């Protein structure tokens, strides 16, 4: 080989190596746009394909949204002989929502049952018309703010004289659109956590919740946004700008008001404070004040004991025998941890539509690969605090359900679902350390492989599973 030819060959090889090394970086930069391109058709298909009211508590969430759309911003305890046993809370909503959901009730918790044309035909004849006191105790305490996409869709549906079913699909699409846009912002802001935020937003469980009529869609997406903003500030090791502090304040307040166990996210600004933390403390105090105000108000006017729970008895028992919490926690985790993992990845419907084992394990590996990408960069000022927040938040989830959903003296904590830990996962990711320098260039490639796995298999597996579960049988 003559010298000019040899030089061209070396240059070509060098260019190819640089191109390959830069591919993961280019893919990472394009993640926000790629997520939109991936999520829009998938979420719209999922919102249409999932039968009406076959997301967790979707009937009660929709009753709450209709109540807000009618001008009642807060739920309240219902009084009178009809609400004595069991006690309930709710407000004025449309009984047509219950009528429209009844034809699909036979499918809930019954994987052998499929929906039929007659179910849709009966339900589609119901429009908005009534306004009466209805109980929806498990959603009556929720604030109105995160129901805004559904409320807007209900206003449009009522103005256009749509049926309740058509308006429900519109509400799902509105919720999904809002959640995917917020998630895209979160991916755009994130530095270290960009891979894992994208992976969490693509999980089957997250996607299903994004296109439900519940507030979970915005709880998850707003948490991703808070983590993305905190991640960027911490990675760049600079003070937070005023608009960033405002965004964190608003988002974290809405998250904690909607689900008090996530109130610990209010502490995240302290994980990135540099020098004097006066401004960050101010943000934290403001967030905690908003959460406390709504929690006290909603507990006073709308909270009722459910599922045989009695918080007073439970608290007295804890004070009397605090060390009994250790075996209760141990039994709960050993009994249900595998279920929590499956539900975190995705058990659809009313926890009655499981996904194949190979896919659940593959998605778990893909999620772990996305976490490795976090280790390609150095962490922010106080990564340990993010871990403390995630652990405290997880404990708060168990504690809240032990008090409000578990029967007194029960040996296990009842009512915990894997999806409750999705908002805490990106917080935990902030705590991961940087990997040794020699391995860092490989990590983005592993994360990219995980994202590609999710992008290919999540739509294929989820759509096929829903089609066979609800329509085709088997």
Indicate residue ranges for each PLM-predicted region.
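Short acidic/glycine- and proline-prone juxtamembrane loop motifs at membrane-interface regions
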Residues: 212-219
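Perimembrane helix-loop-helix junctions
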Residues: 229-246, 263-291
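Membrane-lumen/periplasm interface segments of multi-pass, membrane-embedded glycan/lipid transferases
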Residues: 285, 298-377
């Amino acid at each position: 080989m003559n010298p000019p030819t040899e030089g061209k060959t070396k240059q070509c090889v060098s260019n190819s190596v640089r191109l390959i090394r830069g591919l993961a970086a280019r893919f990472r930069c394009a993640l926000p746009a790629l997520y939109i391109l991936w999520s829009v058709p998938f979420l719209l298909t999922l919102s249409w394909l999932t039968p009406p009211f076959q997301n967790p508590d979707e009937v009660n969430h929709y009753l709450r949204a209709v109540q807000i759309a009618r001008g009642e911003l807060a739920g309240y305890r219902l009084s009178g002989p009809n609400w004595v046993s069991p006690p309930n809370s709710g407000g004025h909503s449309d009984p047509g929502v219950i009528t429209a959901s009844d034809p699909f009730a036979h499918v809930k918790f019954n994987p052998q049952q499929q929906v039929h044309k007659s179910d849709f035909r009966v339900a589609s004849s119901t429009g908005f018309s009534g306004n009466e006191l209805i109980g929806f105790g498990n959603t009556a305490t929720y604030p109105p703010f995160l129901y805004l996409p559904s409320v807007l869709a209900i206003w449009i549906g009522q103005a256009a004289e749509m049926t309740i079913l058509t308006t429900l699909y519109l509400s799902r699409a509105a919720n999904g659109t809002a959640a995917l846009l917020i998630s895209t912002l979160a991916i755009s802001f994130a530095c270290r956590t960009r891979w894992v935020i994208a992976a969490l937003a693509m999980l089957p469980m997250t996607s299903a919740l994004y296109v439900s009529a519940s507030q979970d869609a915005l709880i998850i997406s707003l948490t991703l946004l808070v983590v993305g903003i905190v991640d960027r500030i911490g990675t760049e090791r600079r003070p937070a700008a005023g608009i960033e502090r405002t965004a964190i304040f608003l988002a974290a307040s809405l998250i904690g008001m909607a689900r008090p166990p996530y109130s610990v996210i209010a502490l995240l600004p302290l994980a990135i404070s540099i020098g004097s933390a006066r401004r960050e403390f101010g943000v934290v105090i403001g967030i905690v004040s908003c959460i406390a105000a709504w929690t006290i108000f909603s507990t006073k006017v709308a909270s009722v004991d459910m599922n045989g729970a009695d918080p007073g008895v439970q608290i007295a028992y804890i004070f009397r025998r605090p060390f009994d919490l250790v075996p209760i926690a141990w039994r709960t985790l050993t009994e249900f941890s595998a279920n929590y993992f499956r539900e975190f990845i995705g058990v659809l419907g009313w926890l009655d539509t499981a996904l194949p084992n190979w896919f659940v394990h593959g998605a778990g590996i893909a999620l772990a690969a996305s976490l490795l990408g976090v280790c390609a960069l150095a962490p922010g000022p106080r990564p340990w605090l993010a871990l403390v927040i995630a652990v405290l938040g997880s404990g708060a989830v168990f504690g809240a359900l032990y008090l409000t959903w578990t029967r007194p003296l029960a040996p296990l904590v009842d009512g915990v679902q894997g999806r409750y830990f999705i908002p805490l996962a990106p917080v935990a990711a902030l705590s991961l350390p940087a990997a040794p320098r020699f391995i860092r260039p490989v990590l983005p490639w592993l994360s990219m492989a995980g994202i590609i796995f999710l992008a290919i298999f999540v739509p294929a597996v989820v759509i096929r599973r829903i089609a066979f579960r609800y329509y085709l049988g088997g």
